[in-house]
Amino acid sequence: MNDRISEVSGSSRARRSVLSYGTTETGSDRYTENSNIATENGVDTASSMIDGIQSGFPQPRHGFEEEYNNAEYINMLEQVFYMYYTDKRHRGVISKKNAEPTETIHDWRMRERLKTVSAALLVCLNIGVDPPDVIKPNPAAKYECWIDPFSLPASKALEAIGKNLQQQYETLSMRTRYRHYLDPAIEEVKKLCIGQRRNAKEERILFHYNGHGVPMPTASGEIWVFNKNYTQYIPVSLYDLQSWLGAPCIYVYDCSAAGNIIVNFNRFAEQRDKEALRIAKQNPNVLAMPSHTSCIQLAACGPKETLPMNPDLPADLFTSCLTSPIEISVRWYVLQNPFPNKLNLNMLLKIPGRLQDRRTPLGELNWIFTAITDTIAWNVFPKHLFRRLFRQDLMVAALFRNFLLAERIMLVHSCHPQSSPELPPTHDHPMWNSWDLAIDNCLSQLPDMLDAESKGIAYEYKHSTFFSEQLTAFEVWLSQGLISRKPPDQLPLVLQVLLSQVHRLRALILLSKFLDLGVWAVDLALSIGIFPYVLKLLQSPAIELKPVLVFIWARILAVDDSCQADLLKDNGYGYFVQILNPNSSIFPSSNISEHRAMCAFILSVFCRGFPQGQLACLNPQVLSHCLSHLNSPDSLLRQWACLCISQLWENYSEAKWSGTRDNAHVKLAEIIVDSVPEVRASVLTAFTTFLGFPEKTEEVVAVETYIAIAALAALSDASPLVRHELVIFLSHFVVNYKKQLMVVAYESSLADILEKKNHNSISASTIYETVWQAVLVLAADPSIEISLAAEAIINYVYQSMLNSELRESFLAFLLQHLPALHKASLSKDTDTNSVTSDPKPHPFVPSVSENKILNRSFSLTRSLKGLALSLAGSDRASELLSLNGENKPAESNLNHLTSAKVPGPPAFNELEYQSELDMPLTSYLFDWSRKYFTEPQMRPNEDDEPGSICYNQRLWRRNRNEKLIYRTRPLAEYSTNGRWNQQLMTFNNTIAPRKLMFHQFEDQLITLGDKDIIQVWDWRRNRCLNSFKTSASATTNVTDMQLLNEDDVALLMTGSSDGTIKLYRDYENEKVELVTSWNSLSDLVFGDRNASLLMSWQQNCGHLLVAGDVRVIRIWDASKEICYANLPVRSSNSITSLTSDLVGCNIIVAGFSDGVLRVYDKRLPARDSLTDVWKEHSSEIVNVEMQSSGMRELISASSDGEVKLWDIRMNHSLQTFSTDNSGLTSLTVHSHAPVYATGSSNQSIKIWDTLGQNINTFRENPRFLNQPKPSSLMCLKFHPHHLLLACGDNTDSRVNLYSCTKNEIHTDSPNEF
């Protein structure tokens, strides 16, 4: 049992199997160490390095061989490989559309729940007199309600039959009021029916008709009763019957030719409904009458059929099936059984026990019968019909369960029971075999049970294994690989098993596994009726049920939050409050933190938009419990503790005051720098809901100011998810302090327009000034959804300003400076080559970069100009603009720009998103986060299952990668004596390249050209795969690019001169998408297109090193999306080149503009990270590069043509070579071969080995004799594995590809690669 508990109470996060992606604390994906296809580590496998060392090759430099001989270190590198930027938060913008559930559930609650409150039981037997149209054989069926009518006097027999009929119906529903009318006259029938409708009001009436003693119904459907003297049969028109009984009703017809009644009843019902509709149209004030076509009817046989007269069966076989299914089932089973046994028909009515007691033989049979008929109906009937007939009314459900039995039994006797609504056939369903087996198990013990009972001896009854076997079948279905969305046959049985304490835990565990399959599974479970069961179980004190019940409730509330009132009733929510309590120890699961996270989620849904829920959660200290979990090691618990607090605070001042007393805002501020982006975003959501006290007392202002200051720490966050929540928080802060922000915006706008360097204002250095400047920073955010949201805040403030007392002065000022505004706008719209050389600083606090404000100055100016044009009047505005002759559209000056597309986030519609930007902005983080509980957590994703398409693709890529490395590794020794001037092909790039890069394993060459155009080439087929523009900005340019996750599906990372980092998915095709973006170096000088941002990506540890014209090397942690460290460069010169150890990821080497090389170790504290300074170069460092495998050579080159080899353990270079290049412009080093290449401004390319020997010299673009040789900046790049070299320069758009050829090794065909 404990094993079963742990099975469910295990991690609610994704459990990954072999090859699967796992989820780390920080959210990045990884291949697990058990993976059979664990991929390459970064650029090369550690095993290949070890093989090289053990094969007698020279030892790697820098002392790395010590690490390679460490088995634990090598295992770590080979067995764990992380994938970055593949989490759910990187799959799209969190907008209203994206936060909506991808699947919806049906309305599983019965909104129009009817009850059968009254029943009229008409029995027309006329015992002793056969009707004229019936010829009975001898012997014939005679039992009515299990009574022989000829064993008693006629009057007593009739009375006994009526009494038994009522008792049989009472086993179906005790709450229904029954009246039986025996051999009634027509007057009595009329009076009975009218009285029944009057008493039932609008509820359902049961009308049971036994016509065994009267003629068959007429062709028009009339049924027969008696006159007062019992001398005549009197017909009753169905039209009259409908008038007397009204609707809704359920009719049971037990007579021959009963199908005629249904046919004619429906015909009259349609006529009545049409007439009612006509009257309603003529007089809308008339109350609508219930529809007669919705009445339910059950008939014993078809229109031309006669009831069976088998003497071994009761005469009212149909009634027996409907009201005493167990008795008739066992009798029919014995009659159908050809084998000899000890049973006789009299024994069958003596099965011990009670129907309501499941522990007795009779009760167990009844329980099994209910489960089987429910299962058959669920699997055969349409779902809407199942809900109407089996979940709306106890009486209707019981009758239809038993009707399935009637169909099975009576078909054998040439009767076809009819119903309205018509049902699909179920007589041959396989589950009937299980019913026969259950009967056989009981009857096989019946003689011994009766014998023991007669002797007064206790008998140990062997219970049926039906339910345990069905649970096993359900478990097998769940354990299969690909889960079909076809519901399992056993699902209704699971609900029945919940009634049993013996099987309850197992059933709950299996149910939780089923719900884990997704929204569709929860929808099925709710529609079948799971909710009342799990709601009632919240009252159970059983400790072993707590983990699984928490999981089930989390799944239900993740898709349907309409259960709040249900949880409030009977204190159901207290079940989860008790588990959430950190001092609670009554929990059997070892991973209680994850179940507490689910409890926090459940309570957050309970509070959301439900004031009664908020009030209920305030008293049992839910807030205190959540605060105590903010420092939990489980990130999911931290996240949902914050979100639960946010929902408790939403529009509930008392809860906010309670949080203030508990220092909730201080505790939340402490985790604003949490390692998980979702947690940081959740903190900001909680801050947002805290704002909005109705009264702004000093204490309230102080607390909200504290929160605003704490929230601004997220301004430099690398996760768009966090920054998006920040801009939402700021929108609420702006709305709450609108007057103060209007003053700040007014003064800031004047300063911006007048370009005042020192603008004194009453709001300077206040929190409102800081907030306003933060909004301006966010308006320049590289993520479009954030910048649009920030612009909405700016527009809101300006519109509020123009609707306030500042309107006149501000409008007059705008009109006065409108021409200047328009000129500034045009100049910034059209100037694509330069920006203002002396940008005016914006008044700002030290905590926010001024350059970010300047980056947004154009948008601010444009906004002000737009406001002025719209408010000042078109005539005056046109006049002012015409004075300057600048009313031509700005787009005419942009024709020279390329029309290449700029990728955005996946499925992002800017217009649709802007329509959602109402102030204050709405956060959809909660809805987005709750989707976690709709995704499978107990089993790997389908893509990670062996045999799936994605699995096979990943396996193929792994094999391809290993094969490529295995095939290219031996070529390294031939690289130093081959011919490198063999030109394989030329790529006709559309624009001159500035940087080149090969994919390690795909046949891709990526070029970065002017105007930030990136082109992706298939170098084997000389085909351009895709071309796109990384930015529409004319003031920055992309200066570096890297590839991430190359072993699987790579992402392309670009870095711009303004510090912006962008990542792209599917960059090789037209569906390229922006994954994420952020500003990595906010201190870079804005507008300096010569500024360079340099990057070094360390795949093994997920660190991105960023440097440029700043005084630090900033290290970003990709998994946490935060700044890991800032290493001081200890130099006033700019960094011109950056490299690092891509295996151990600890050593960083930077080259500077003054020729100095500096070595850093990021394992050391930041202030002590500088370990070596090499000053041997006398001119600017062009490039410094460390091999990722092979000898791990570290090579640097300066612009004067000097190349040096280094070992980080030495304080001087190992070797120095002079390339004799006049104006060396580029250096590239092969990843594992002992060669490097240099390029000069005269387009001369030289290939060298690491001993300083020149292998080849050739020119990139040969010219004719008298043609001048322009100076150019060359770009070179080796393929990481193949012996290929790509070359380009900034005077020609062509890119040439060269290979190292040697007759013994290669042919001249590129297919060799």
From Swiss-Prot:
The modification Phosphoserine is found at S834, S837, S882. The keyword Kinase does not apply. Pfam families: Raptor_N (PF14538), WD40 (PF00400). It is found in: Cytoplasm. GO terms for biological process: cellular response to amino acid stimulus; cellular response to starvation; meiotic cell cycle; positive regulation of cell growth; positive regulation of conjugation with cellular fusion; regulation of autophagy; sporulation resulting in formation of a cellular spore; TOR signaling. Keywords: Cytoplasm, Meiosis, Phosphoprotein, Repeat, Sporulation, WD repeat. Residues 1-35 are annotated as: Disordered. One of its GO terms (molecular function) is protein-macromolecule adaptor activity. Signal peptide: none annotated. Transmembrane segments: none annotated. One of its GO terms (cellular component) is TORC1 complex. WD repeats lie at residues 986-1029, 1033-1074, 1087-1126, 1130-1170, 1176-1216, 1219-1259, 1268-1308. Its main location: cytoplasm. Component of TORC1, which regulates multiple cellular processes to control cell growth in response to environmental signals. Tor2 is essential for growth. Nutrient limitation and environmental stress signals cause inactivation of TORC1. Active TORC1 positively controls cell growth and ribosome biogenesis by regulating ribosomal protein gene expression. TORC1 negatively controls G1 cell-cycle arrest, sexual development and amino acid uptake. Belongs to the WD repeat RAPTOR family. The target of rapamycin complex 1 (TORC1) is composed of at least mip1, pop3/wat1, tco89, toc1 and tor2. This is Target of rapamycin complex 1 subunit mip1. It comes from Schizosaccharomyces pombe (strain 972 / ATCC 24843) (Fission yeast). The lineage of its organism: Eukaryota, Fungi, Dikarya, Ascomycota, Taphrinomycotina. The gene is mip1.
